[in-house]
Amino acid sequence: METESADIPPNQTLYVNNLYEKISKKKLIEQLLLLFSKYGPILEIVGSKSLKMRGQAFIVFKDITSASNALREMNGFNFLDRPMKIQYCKSKSDAVSKLDGTYMEKKREREENDKKGSNKKQDRKSTGQQQQQQKRPGAPTSTTSTTSPTTSNGTVSLQPRDDPPNKTLFVENLPDKCDSMMLSMLFSQFQGFKEVHMVESKKGIAFIEFEDEIKSGFAMTNLQHFKVTPEKPMVVSFAAQ
């Protein structure tokens, strides 16, 4: 394992295993966030409920320095009575790809490959239909085939609001169980953080106050689309004045 880890170059994503398995995915992510957020801004923490992936997680930092410090200090740390085993991840995460601008290139490559595969499959299907038609007595020499164009995957991209800079941030698309303590842990990583205001009358939104709009803008950039839970990327905007 040590030889394999040494062969992997340092990067922003850490692979963590030997974790306690009898803990919910939500609780695991919350606990890992508490432990690792002190090393630097975290873009994403990925866990899984599947039997194959139990006891494992991926922690995506914004920069390599933060990930390296976390690996050095937390590898072997006794977490829920089990020593964590940490190494750099072999491949770049989508979160990091979005940050450095290579995500869309990867996405286009995947879409092009999927489209090529789909076109080949459709061509084979059309050829087979034509051959079947031609075998029938009295069948026309050619047939017209109609296919539906390939649509996108339907994923909704939540965009931040286009409001002028403000020292207060408006955060939405939060999971219902997200509370002020969780948000304080996230945003207190950034200089100038003051306090969190939860909106009790409406779940899923909150206001985060900073000393000035420069500090709030830095926090917004770093935590934009951070996944508090795997299915809930939060959307951060300047609050309307």
Curated annotation (Swiss-Prot):
Origin: domain of life: Eukaryota
This protein's GO CC annotations: spliceosomal complex; U1 snRNP
GO molecular function: U1 snRNA binding
Chain residue ranges for the region called Disordered: 99-169
Biased composition (Basic and acidic residues): 99-126
InterPro entries assigned: Nucleotide-bd_a/b_plait_sf, RBD_domain_sf, RRM_dom
Biased composition annotated in UniProt, kind: Low complexity: 129-152
UniProt entry keywords in alphabetical sequence: mRNA processing, mRNA splicing, Nucleus, Repeat, Ribonucleoprotein, RNA-binding, Spliceosome
The UniProt record lists the keyword RNA-binding: yes
One GO BP: mRNA splicing, via spliceosome
Broad class of the protein's primary localization: nucleus
Record-annotated RRM domain positions: 12-91, 167-241
Keyword Repeat: yes
PANTHER family assigned: U1 SMALL NUCLEAR RIBONUCLEOPROTEIN A/U2 SMALL NUCLEAR RIBONUCLEOPROTEIN B (PTHR10501)
Complex and partners: Identified in the spliceosome B complex. Identified in the spliceosome C complex.
Reported function: Involved in pre-mRNA splicing as component of the spliceosome. Associated with sn-RNP U2, where it contributes to the binding of stem loop IV of U2 snRNA.
Name of the protein described by the UniProt record: U2 small nuclear ribonucleoprotein B''
Classification of source organism: Eukaryota, Amoebozoa, Evosea, Eumycetozoa, Dictyostelia
